């Protein structure tokens, strides 16, 4: 019996690698030997500009999609919420993995009084709108980076009373958090491949 290597493209963040490892573990058999291929995305390189203002479709997926089209990888692991509604020509969604928790959570160093003015960090327009709808006296500031980077920024910040994170993302890197509207496809992982 011959063993086939399956090259799995993934972003380099701890969360992305964890997600890709779960896919790798589920695909490993006696005849398939998956290997992870980390690839840096535009969204991981530029950590200052808000994602919505970057003007790039698939800011976290484009580099992996190009690697698929160039046959450098066989499948990619994306968070489905990051995938553009129209895939690049030649790619299809090969699978969608079972959804994780769809909740958002507030992470803080000291529990803030949510009835008083506060400054909350998030890079998501959806989270910003949702939070300000409920807490109109609060101010929202932008934050960029992977989960670990954002947690470090929150820890060092003297301005922020807290930051909003994905419960599933925190859980996937080993941090388990304890009311929100979620974006379409939030917490779904998808595996694009060549058509």
Briefly describe each language-model feature range.
Residues 1-81, 88-91, 195:
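N-terminal hydrophobic or amphipathic helices and topogenic motifs
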Residues 18-19, 85-86, 130-131, 150-153, ...:
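Phosphate- and divalent-cation-binding pockets in alpha/beta enzyme and binding domains
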Residues 36-38, 138-146:
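Short beta-strand-to-loop elements that line the ligand-binding cleft
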Residues 68, 154-155:
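Hydrophobic residues within well-ordered alpha-helices
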Residues 80-81, 89-137:
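A conserved helix-loop-strand patch within extracytoplasmic ligand-binding domains
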Residues 81-87, 155, 160-179:
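A ligand-binding cleft/hinge motif common to bilobed small-molecule-binding domains
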Residues 98-102, 143-148, 169:
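Short, acidic/turn-prone active-site loops that include or flank metal/cofactor-
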Residues 187-193:
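Conserved small/polar residues in nucleotide/adenosyl-binding loops
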């Amino acid at each position: 019996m011959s063993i086939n290597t399956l090259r799995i493209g993934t972003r380099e963040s701890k969360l992305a690698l964890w997600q890709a490892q779960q896919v790798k573990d589920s695909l490993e058999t006696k005849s398939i030997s998956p290997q992870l291929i980390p690839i840096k995305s535009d969204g991981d390189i530029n950590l200052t500009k808000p994602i919505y203002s970057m003007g790039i479709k698939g800011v976290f997926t484009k580099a992996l999609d190009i690697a698929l089209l160039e046959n450098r990888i066989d499948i990619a692991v994306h968070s489905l919420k990051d995938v553009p509604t129209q895939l690049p020509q030649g790619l299809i969604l090969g699978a969608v993995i079972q959804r994780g928790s769809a909740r958002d959570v507030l992470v803080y160093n000291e529990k803030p009084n949510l009835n008083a003015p506060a400054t909350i960090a998030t890079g998501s327009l959806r989270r910003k709108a949702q939070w300000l709808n409920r807490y109109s006296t609060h101010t929202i500031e932008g934050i960029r980076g992977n989960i670990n980077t954002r947690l470090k920024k929150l820890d060092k910040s003297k301005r922020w009373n807290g930051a909003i994170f994905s419960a599933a993302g925190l859980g996937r890197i080993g941090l388990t958090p304890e009311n929100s509207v979620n974006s379409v496809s939030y917490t779904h992982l998808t595996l694009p491949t060549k058509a």
